[in-house]
Regions:
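Glycine-rich beta-strand-centered segment in the early N-terminal region that forms part
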Residues: 29-46, 54-98
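NAD(P)H dinucleotide-binding glycine-rich loop of Rossmann-like/cofactor-binding domains
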Residues: 72-77, 88-145
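Short structural boundary motif marking the start of a folded domain
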Residues: 2-7
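Short glycine-/acidic-enriched loop or helix-start segments at secondary-structure transitions
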Residues: 50-51, 104
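Flexible, glycine-rich phosphate/dinucleotide-binding loops
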Residues: 15, 85, 101
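Short glycine/threonine/proline-enriched tight-turn/helix- or strand-capping micro-motif at secondary-structure
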Residues: 17-28
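Short acidic-glycine loop/turn motifs at beta-strand connectors
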Residues: 10, 82, 105-106
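Short N-terminal binding/cap micro-motifs at the start of the first secondary-structure element
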Residues: 13-19, 48-49
């Protein structure tokens, strides 16, 4: 049986998160259902909101439960597709969690433009963090050239 790896969230941190808050485990390779794709994750985003989720439910998301795959956005390559709009070799952005492979709903993923390099820009400057910074600089601070 082919396996993959994933990080589980195992306990809330006291102070700063540390290695003991997570556990790296081997799991069977996920199988895809109709409408899903199997993604091999290349990049993971490490975001400030993770810490808040480790403390329990806040705002728009439920808190993390011990034993769950650690949350987070990732960029990966489609290695198997059962979703018409994505093909093997496409790169996508989505809520992948901290794992090497994930079976994800194709409709929930954003297909990336491979001409934009490095692809990791989609997790920073071209992603949620960059959008948040842009609102702060241009809408709030009214930055001028």
């Amino acid at each position: 049986m082919t396996t993959t790896r994933q990080f589980l969230y195992v306990r809330p941190p006291v102070g700063m998160p540390e290695e003991s808050c997570f556990e790296l485990v081997a799991r069977p390779m996920p199988q895809t259902a109709e409408g899903q794709v199997l993604v091999r994750i290349h990049y993971l985003s490490i975001d400030p909101y993770f810490r808040r989720q480790m403390a329990g439910a806040h705002g728009y998301r439920d808190g993390l439960r011990p034993g769950a795959v650690m949350i987070g956005r990732g960029i990966g390559e489609v290695v198997e597709s059962r979703f018409a709009d994505l093909a093997r070799g496409d790169f996508v952005l989505g809520e992948t969690g901290w794992r090497a492979h994930a079976a994800l709903d194709g409709a929930a993923l954003k297909k990336l433009d491979p001409a934009i390099q490095p692809l990791s820009l989609y997790l920073g400057l071209l992603g949620q963090s960059g959008g948040t910074a842009g609102i702060g600089l241009f809408d709030v601070a009214r930055l001028q050239p």
